[in-house]
């Protein structure tokens, strides 16, 4: 291995070329497989620049294959080629002074778009690269932030347990903190326009439509009264032990995940014509869409962040009630939902049972049973067939006359609460504050 490659990165790679596993399927052309093998040979004979160049060639070629058909139809073989390309490109960048952050980004995109190779080698290299350049990233953060946000405590000065998420996120949601108490008592005048905080109205809930709340039910009680009959319920006290409820702050997320690349939704809701997605670092997302409210709506939504960043996964747990399903723990899909006040998930349904755990901020949620489907006017298209055409909080009664006849339940989900959404139940979600939620899809 060439000495220009950081020793910590070299330590993660196989010791010899013979131990470097290249496993590709029959669909991959011989010349492409030979390119992968030549890049590996370059790596082990110290031709790092050539190795990186071949990696870039593999990325470009396999990218065309990944985009030639529907993503679900793309075989693992070409995604593996993409991952090998990212690996070789990243190693090449590691040998260039000042390119560690770019190497991190290349590895992350390999994780997001490619397939796992060599026992999660890309993930292990990312962990190494994060350790190599933490001080550089912290210096960059301070430069972007300028003067430290008042009230946003330095993680170096306080241990995670010394402040709750309410305090840690207060400076971002506004210095005038939302007063505690019943949700219906929330005063929107407490928001300060000058602080660029949206003054979002909080719905006043009707007791007849409120989703019931239950404190730490037994597995049997939850199964018999909610899972089997398929009824929504807000669970309380079941995630109080999760470290994230005390540890997570904007600064903590930046420190642990700031340099990582993630997909961000741009636009108020995915049904809008101007909606789009873009890859960016968590730091860029926070700077543009959390700390600065003038760039429109950005939402880190429905992303398997915890598979990408194991450090964050250590702060949560899979709810015990998931054991009542037939699937194994590995088959449970865990998604992160992180965004400013005002993000909206249009009325839609999911094909699995759903536990939505609220970590930071509050969300207004309305749910409709499957029996109400005809009154909810789903899109006719195959892509959006699980999504309603109706704007739930501002429906067009002339266009959707039966919508007002649909029965629903609703809640305001607060930190520490978990909402059970039965399979295929329709649900609409709007963030009332800066919010971080974790969903668990299980069968």
Curated annotation (Swiss-Prot):
JmjC domain span: 298-443
Cofactor binding remark: Binds 1 Fe(2+) ion per subunit.
Keywords, in A-Z order: Biological rhythms, Cell cycle, Chromatin regulator, Dioxygenase, Iron, Metal-binding, Nucleus, Oxidoreductase, Transcription, Transcription regulation
Gene Ontology MF, one: histone H3K36 demethylase activity
Subcellular location: Nucleus
GO cellular component annotations of the record: nucleus
Major localisation: nucleus
EC number annotated for this UniProt entry: 1.14.11.27
Cofactor(s) needed for function: Fe(2+)
Enzyme class: oxidoreductase
InterPro entries for the chain: ARM_KDM8_N, Cupin_8, JmjC_dom
Residues annotated for Fe cation binding in this entry: 348, 350, 427
Region (Disordered): 139-174
GO terms, biological process: circadian regulation of gene expression; G2/M transition of mitotic cell cycle; positive regulation of DNA-templated transcription
Protein function: Histone demethylase required for G2/M phase cell cycle progression. Specifically demethylates dimethylated 'Lys-36' (H3K36me2) of histone H3, an epigenetic repressive mark, thereby acting as a transcription activator. May play a role in the regulation of the circadian clock.
Protein name: Lysine-specific demethylase 8
Organism for this UniProt entry: Xenopus tropicalis
Organism placement in taxonomy: Eukaryota, Metazoa, Chordata, Craniata, Vertebrata
Chain's gene name: kdm8
């Amino acid at each position: 291995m060439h000495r220009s490659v950081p020793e910590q990165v070299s330590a993660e790679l196989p010791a010899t070329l013979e131990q470097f596993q290249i496993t590709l399927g029959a669909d991959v052309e011989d010349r492409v497989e030979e390119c992968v093998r030549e890049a590996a040979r370059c790596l082990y004979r110290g031709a790092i620049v050539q190795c990186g160049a071949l990696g870039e060639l593999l990325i470009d070629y396999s990218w065309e294959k990944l985009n030639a058909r529907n993503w679900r139809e793309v075989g693992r073989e070409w995604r593996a080629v993409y991952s090998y390309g990212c690996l070789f490109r990243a190693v090449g960048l590691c040998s260039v002074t000042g390119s560690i952050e770019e190497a991190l980004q290349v590895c992350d995109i390999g994780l997001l778009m490619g397939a796992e190779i060599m026992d999660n080698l890309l993930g292990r290299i990312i962990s190494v690269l994060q350790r190599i350049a933490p001080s550089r990233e912290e210096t960059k953060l301070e430069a972007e932030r300028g003067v430290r946000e008042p009230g946003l405590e330095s993680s170096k000065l306080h241990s995670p347990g010394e402040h709750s998420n309410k305090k840690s996120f207060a400076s971002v949601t506004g210095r005038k903190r939302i007063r505690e108490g019943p949700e219906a008592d929330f005063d929107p005048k407490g928001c300060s326009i000058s602080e660029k905080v949206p003054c979002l109205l909080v719905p006043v809930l009707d007791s007849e439509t409120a989703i019931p709340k239950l404190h730490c039910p037994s597995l049997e009680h939850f199964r018999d009264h909610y899972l089997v009959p398929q009824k929504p319920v807000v669970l309380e006290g079941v995630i109080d032990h999760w470290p994230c409820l005390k540890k997570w702050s904007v600064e903590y997320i930046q420190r642990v995940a700031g340099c990582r690349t993630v997909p961000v939704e741009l636009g108020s809701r995915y049904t809008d014509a101007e909606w789009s997605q873009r890859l960016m670092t968590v730091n860029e997302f926070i700077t543009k869409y959390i700390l600065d409210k003038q760039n429109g709506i950005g939402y880190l939504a429905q992303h398997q962040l915890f598979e990408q960043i194991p450090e964050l996964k250590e702060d949560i747990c899979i709810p015990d009630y998931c054991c009542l399903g037939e699937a194994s723990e590995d088959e449970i899909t865990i998604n992160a939902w992180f965004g400013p006040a005002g993000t909206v998930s249009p009325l839609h349904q999911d094909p699995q049972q759903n536990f939505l755990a609220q970590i930071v901020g509050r969300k207004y949620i309305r749910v409709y049973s499957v029996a109400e489907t005809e009154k909810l006017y789903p899109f006719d298209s195959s892509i959006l067939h699980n999504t309603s055409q109706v704007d739930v909080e501002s429906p067009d009664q002339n266009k959707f006359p039966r919508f007002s006849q649909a029965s629903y339940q609703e809640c305001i989900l607060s930190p520490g609460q978990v909402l059970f959404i039965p399979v295929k139940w329709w649900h609409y979600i709007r963030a009332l504050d800066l919010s971080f939620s974790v969903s668990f899809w299980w069968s």
